[in-house]
């Protein structure tokens, strides 16, 4: 079964996120558990935690259907010790917030070397950052998102994701989220079913589908292999509809959150309905 949704707002309280997801016909959703542009946030109160759990139950969202995202400020591979510690503390707080809310996944961008340390050293720092957070939490999987490779961001090659996973001690609590726009911009072709087969065969060989814990379904304004991160609405960008139809009709993408971060929230309901229809088309066929 496919879990399909979007990254919804938690404005006005975390309990509003499941309701907003339900309004657009979603069977999955992503959210920020705090302001993503601030380092610190007030601790979650028992009331906030209870309200969120009740709302998830009301709208039939289990933890397996929810893919929270951490702050954009965090850089788990930061080359400067003080900044690295600040990021590690913030990441631990994000993991602990998920644990308190009964969530089992936390999606994050791996990190950047900022042209100051070697790529291998940065990847090792990211893995160690994950180890530190996992050692102080229970039940939450750290989900590494592939990047477009913009600037000095790492995680744009499957080999880099595999290297981070290799450095994580508890393999049962690390996974990846593949963003289709990022993959395309990083040079993984998705424009035809044949290209999708090739790209995900490579993913399976290098990373492994056992680590796939979520996806971001985004078309790309950016050009193939451009290393530029620019999302677009499904079918409107340079990837086109075929990739998303192919994903909907492949069982390897069942049982994980498939999250839209497309640029027009006004048509998320339509995009979700279209994705669901592709799945039904497969069943009929």
UniProtKB/Swiss-Prot annotation:
Q: Where does Zn(2+) 2 bind?
A: 145, 179, 216, 261
Free-text comment on the cofactor: Binds 3 Zn(2+) ions.
Q: List its EC numbers.
A: 3.1.21.2
**Pfam families attached here?**
AP_endonuc_2 (PF01261)
Against InterPro entries, the record matches this protein to:
AP_endonuc_2 (IPR001719), AP_endonuc_F2_Zn_BS (IPR018246), Xyl_isomerase-like_sf (IPR036237), Xyl_isomerase-like_TIM-brl (IPR013022)
The answer on whether this UniProt entry bears the keyword Disulfide bond reads no
Task: Please list the residues that bind Zn(2+) 1.
Answer: 69, 109, 145
Tell me which positions the record assigns to the signal sequence: none
Annotated keywords: DNA damage, DNA repair, Endonuclease, Hydrolase, Metal-binding, Nuclease, Zinc
Could you provide one GO biological process annotation from this protein's UniProt record? base-excision repair
Cofactor(s) listed: Zn(2+)
Can you name one GO molecular function term for this protein? DNA binding
Its recorded reaction(s) are:
Endonucleolytic cleavage to 5'-phosphooligonucleotide end-products
Q: Where does Zn(2+) 3 bind?
A: 182, 229, 231
Q: Which family does it belong to?
A: Belongs to the AP endonuclease 2 family.
PANTHER family per the UniProt record, alphabetical: APURINIC-APYRIMIDINIC ENDONUCLEASE, ENDONUCLEASE IV ENDODEOXYRIBONUCLEASE IV
- What's this protein's function? Endonuclease IV plays a role in DNA repair. It cleaves phosphodiester bonds at apurinic or apyrimidinic (AP) sites, generating a 3'-hydroxyl group and a 5'-terminal sugar phosphate.
Which HAMAP family does the record associate with it? Nfo
What is the name of the protein in this document?
Probable endonuclease 4
Q: What is the organism of origin for this protein?
A: Salmonella newport (strain SL254)
What gene name is given for the protein in this entry? nfo
């Amino acid at each position: 079964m496919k879990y399909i949704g979007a990254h919804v707002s938690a404005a006005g309280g975390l309990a509003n996120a499941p309701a907003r997801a339900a309004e657009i016909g979603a069977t999955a959703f992503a959210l920020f558990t705090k302001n993503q542009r601030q380092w610190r946030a007030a601790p979650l109160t028992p009331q906030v935690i209870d309200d969120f759990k009740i709302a998830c139950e009301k709208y039939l969202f289990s933890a397996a259907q929810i893919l929270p995202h951490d702050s954009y400020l965090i850089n788990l591979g930061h080359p400067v010790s003080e900044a690295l510690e600040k990021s590690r503390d913030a990441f631990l707080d994000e993991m602990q917030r998920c644990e308190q809310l009964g969530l089992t996944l936390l999606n994050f961008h791996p990190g950047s070397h900022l042209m100051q340390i070697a790529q291998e050293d940065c990847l090792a720092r990211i893995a160690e950052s994950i180890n530190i957070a996992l050692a102080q939490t229970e039940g939450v999987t750290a989900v590494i998102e592939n990047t477009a490779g913009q600037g000095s961001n790492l995680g744009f090659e499957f080999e880099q994701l595999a290297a981070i996973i290799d450095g994580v001690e508890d393999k049962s609590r690390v996974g990846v989220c593949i963003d289709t726009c990022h993959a395309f911009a990083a040079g993984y072709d998705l424009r035809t079913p044949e290209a999708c087969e090739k790209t995900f065969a490579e993913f399976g060989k290098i990373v492994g589908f056992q680590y796939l814990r979520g996806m971001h379904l985004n078309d790309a304004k950016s050009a193939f292999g451009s290393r530029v991160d620019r999302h677009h609405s499904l079918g409107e960008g340079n990837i086109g509809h075929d990739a998303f139809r192919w994903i909907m009709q492949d069982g390897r993408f069942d049982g994980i959150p498939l999250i839209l971060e497309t640029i027009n929230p006004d048509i998320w309901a339509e995009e979700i309905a279209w994705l669901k229809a592709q799945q039904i088309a497969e069943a009929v066929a």
